[in-house]
Amino acid sequence: MITKADKNATRKKRHARVRAKLTGTAERPRLNVFRSNQHIYAQVIDDVNGVTLVSASTLDKDLALNGTSNTEAATKVGESVAKRAVEKGVKEVVFDRGGYLYHGRVKALAEAAREAGLQF
């Protein structure tokens, strides 16, 4: 039986493999996604300078959310992080799915960010 700890360890290994090949620059930063059971978080990161440019999550007070662990909440987080990034002058990003499958909440966040103006 696969336990939650085993799944998370596998995800972390997968993320480490992907991160070895992915780097965010000032011109094209990395859009990182972290998904917990209750919330979803997105950050636009410049890895060269080690700086988070913008971030958004379901914990933000300005996002009026009914539930925080569903695809609608992920969509709102994607729109929010994209709007904040475009305001900072970031138009292109590298998408880092954080070792998660491109499905469900991660996919909803990515598609909402694309529709709100980010290119990846």
From Swiss-Prot:
This is one of the proteins that bind and probably mediate the attachment of the 5S RNA into the large ribosomal subunit, where it forms part of the central protuberance. GO terms for molecular function: 5S rRNA binding; structural constituent of ribosome. This is Large ribosomal subunit protein uL18. GO terms for cellular component: cytosolic large ribosomal subunit. GO terms for biological process: translation. Part of the 50S ribosomal subunit; part of the 5S rRNA/L5/L18/L25 subcomplex. Contacts the 5S and 23S rRNAs. Pfam families: Ribosomal_L18p (PF00861). The keyword rRNA-binding applies. It comes from Bacillus cereus (strain G9842). Keywords: Ribonucleoprotein, Ribosomal protein, RNA-binding, rRNA-binding. PANTHER family: 39S RIBOSOMAL PROTEIN L18, MITOCHONDRIAL (PTHR12899), LARGE RIBOSOMAL SUBUNIT PROTEIN UL18M (PTHR12899:SF3). Belongs to the universal ribosomal protein uL18 family.
